[in-house]
């Protein structure tokens, strides 16, 4: 094994003696349990030992590049991982990662904190990035593949060219669970809104995430006209940089109106799909962006995009989003969106409902920023 730390460990399997050596001795070491992980903090370094397995809600190896801790964590752990504003910064001390397999522990290498979240000063979640990625063989040993599950299907795709209302309903009810529903299902009440928006609001009563987590469709009480009083604003970017709207009239709504994209000080631009297609595209985009399991390649060429998407199904809609025209590709439990501003360099983002859905992308010859498969 390549030496990644200040103390060489000659074998992959290590024991309490190795832990003591790494942290600087057993006498002054502090021991904690955080989200099922054992954390030993010493004057020299830190050892984090997680359980083998694949539990999205708990601490453990997340991918070949990442290990996650789920808190809350005590103050000593928070200070060691994040540093302390009133004392010497301890966050630069090395962090060693191990995984427990039955009665033995395997040393995986060193890692650095890449992202952490706190609540009232308490560490709640922490992501650490391995300094040297794990091999696929080792990853499968310490994070055994989950058993196969029924993935969201593609029945909805057959309706995109015909019954788009059915396609939207099938995709949202297939992708999102209604376990967190807070309101009973309801039929659409009479409204001046187009049928597509009424349908989305009905679906969102049982599946609130259908209104978006990256960008969002405004709840019905939040709909408003723009500053000129000409357009009904119904969708907004998460930082307020742009919005989507429909032409506002006192007459009844169009059956399938044009959707207008607009930065606040720019002229509006028509989305290429009317509302029925736009809502499918919006739902696909939000599903991929908010997915638990992601695959994010670095910038791709057109040839790489063709290879990246060859095992997937193209969603037969015109490009979404005027800023960077975006196409969607799908497989069971998987949504990929590919965009380009110049037609030469492409950005791709894949989101999956289950880790196994990323399998079609696993062996692609691309440089990954992140791959959760």
Q: Where do the language-model regions lie?
A:
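A surface-exposed partner-binding patch
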Residues: 2-268, 283-297, 303-321, 373
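Carbohydrate-interacting/catalytic domains
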Residues: 261-264, 278, 359-362
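Extended, charged low-complexity segments
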Residues: 330-373
């Amino acid at each position: 094994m390549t030496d990644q730390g200040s103390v060489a460990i000659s074998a992959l399997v290590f024991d309490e003696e190795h832990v003591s050596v790494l942290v600087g001795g057993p006498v002054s070491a502090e021991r904690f349990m955080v989200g099922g992980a054992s954390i030993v903090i010493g004057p020299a370094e830190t050892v984090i030992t997680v359980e083998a397995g694949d539990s999205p809600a708990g601490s453990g190896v997340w991918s070949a590049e990442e290990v996650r801790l789920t808190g809350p964590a005590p103050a000593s752990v928070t200070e060691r991982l994040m540093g302390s504003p009133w004392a010497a910064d301890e966050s630069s001390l090395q962090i060693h990662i191990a995984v427990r397999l039955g009665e033995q522990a395997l040393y995986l290498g060193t890692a650095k904190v890449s992202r952490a979240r706190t609540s009232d000063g308490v560490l709640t979640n922490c992501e650490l990035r391995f300094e040297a990625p794990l091999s696929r063989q080792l990853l499968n040993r310490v994070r055994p593949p989950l058993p196969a599950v029924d993935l969201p299907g593609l029945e909805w795709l057959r309706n995109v060219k015909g019954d788009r209302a059915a396609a939207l309903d099938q995709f949202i009810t297939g992708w999102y669970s209604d376990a967190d529903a807070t309101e009973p299902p309801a039929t659409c009440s009479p409204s001046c809104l187009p049928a597509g928006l009424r349908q989305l609001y009905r679906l969102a009563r049982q599946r609130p995430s259908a209104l978006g987590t990256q960008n969002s469709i405004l709840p019905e009480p939040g709909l408003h006209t723009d500053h000129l009083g000409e357009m009904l604003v119904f969708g907004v970017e998460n930082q307020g940089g742009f919005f989507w709207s429909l032409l506002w009239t006192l007459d009844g709504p169009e059956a399938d109106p044009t959707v207008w994209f607009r930065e606040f000080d720019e002229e509006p631009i028509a989305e290429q799909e009317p509302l029925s297609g736009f809502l499918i595209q919006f739902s696909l985009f939000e599903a991929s962006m908010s997915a638990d399991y992601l695959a994010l390649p670095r910038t791709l060429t057109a040839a790489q995009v063709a290879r990246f998407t060859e095992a997937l199904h193209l969603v037969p809609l015109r490009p979404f989003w005027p800023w960077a025209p975006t196409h969607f590709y799908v497989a069971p439990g998987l949504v990929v969106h590919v965009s380009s501003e110049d037609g030469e360099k492409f950005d791709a983002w894949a989101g999956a409902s289950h880790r196994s859905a990323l399998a079609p992308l696993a062996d692609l010859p691309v440089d990954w920023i992140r791959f959760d498969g």
